[in-house]
Amino acid sequence: MKRNMKWIRTKLPIIIPIILVIALAVVCVNLWQHKTIEENDLMVMCKSSVNAAMEHFENYQSNGNEVEYISGVAEFRAYMTTYLCLTDEPSDADYTWCNILYGYMTMKPEEVKANISDLIDALEYLAEDYDHPNGFNLINALNNKIAAE
């Protein structure tokens, strides 16, 4: 019995920290993988929202169907939401430019519709890469163009 107690007193302080370190490493790896998977899912959602918005706006451009325009605006808003989740920076200038454009889409739809080809050009860049700087520059230029009208 004394021998077992001696073993417990000498080996247990070494074994417990090793087990805790292994458990902590497993938890950290699991959390890292979950974050990576979640980020990949958000990127897919972001890209699919931009592609859907672009498709709706192209359909609106070709047939003038108001439902296509409204669907494009909704998909653009979905893109903005996923973009914000990916960047975690609500004060990001790119997000602000998108937010201004979204405001124009809802409050001044006729001005946006008159410049729908410029909007589609911007979305083509964002369809390639959800944070492509040229896409945001074209969105900013479109905002300035609409503001000047």
Regions found by a protein language model. Name each.
Residues 22-44:
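Transmembrane signal-anchor/signal-peptide helices with a preference for the extracytoplasmic
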Residues 2-22:
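N-terminal Sec-pathway targeting helices
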